Amino acid sequence: MPRYLKGWLKDVVQLSLRRPSFRASRQRPIISLNERILEFNKRNITAIIAEYKRKSPSGLDVERDPIEYSKFMERYAVGLSILTEEKYFNGSYETLRKIASSVSIPILMKDFIVKESQIDDAYNLGADTVLLIVKILTERELESLLEYARSYGMEPLIEINDENDLDIALRIGARFIGINSRDLETLEINKENQRKLISMIPSNVVKVAESGISERNEIEELRKLGVNAFLIGSSLMRNPEKIKEFIL
């Protein structure tokens, strides 16, 4: 863990380090999220990764049935992102397991992953890939976890928020990068910074815009910049029907 982490982010990483493993047995084959995104792009279909989360440090607090939500999103989304962090997002491994056994589209386990056993859990629970956040790992840790996830046939989504993060992601050979407009420490959104980072990423990397997307015109603007997919959580949790507007 990098020494500079503080506040809720330091707390959530420490909780992740202590989190026990979950006993489960995978019931489905790996379905590649990044490859499905590229298929959507070829067919000119807007690739939305619909996120399921009950709450967040930025203010979301919504209760929806996870199976009902996921089955609805399965008809429109390229994949699902399932928050499994317990304290700050009210997520659970059990929710991920239930969703994975109910849908047949790719699933991203979104958590604060800091150790290999969490990747074991993701695979065993039925997730098809995991989120690795550059900000909460040393470069050596990040590279090791990336290779470990790939040993399962997963291509992790590597999340960045600034140029230093991007440099690290490219150095370790990231093929699938999430550009988060929200600073995880301050929780502030900076869309100009996100757009600048997008312009710096090579065209052969699959790019996902994360956080703060609530309108169709934002998706159109980001697509023109070369974004391949859009991870949307709060907006869809508040109003699931909005995905129909996003994919028009």
From Swiss-Prot:
Any Pfam family the entry gives: IGPS
Single GO BP term: L-tryptophan biosynthetic process
Keywords for this protein: Amino-acid biosynthesis, Aromatic amino acid biosynthesis, Decarboxylase, Lyase, Tryptophan biosynthesis
InterPro entries, per the entry: Aldolase_TIM, Indole-3-glycerol_P_synth, Indole-3-glycerol_P_synth_dom, Indole-3-GlycerolPSynthase_CS, RibuloseP-bd_barrel
Pathway(s) served: Amino-acid biosynthesis; L-tryptophan biosynthesis; L-tryptophan from chorismate: step 4/5
GO molecular function terms listed in the Swiss-Prot or TrEMBL record: indole-3-glycerol-phosphate synthase activity; phosphoribosylanthranilate isomerase activity
The enzyme's E.C. designation: 4.1.1.48
Catalytic activity: 1-(2-carboxyphenylamino)-1-deoxy-D-ribulose 5-phosphate + H(+) = (1S,2R)-1-C-(indol-3-yl)glycerol 3-phosphate + CO2 + H2O
Presence of keyword Lyase: yes
Subunit structure: Monomer.
HAMAP family referenced in this protein's UniProt entry, alphabetically: IGPS_A (MF_00134_A)
The protein's name: Indole-3-glycerol phosphate synthase
Provenance organism: Saccharolobus solfataricus (strain ATCC 35092 / DSM 1617 / JCM 11322 / P2) (Sulfolobus solfataricus)
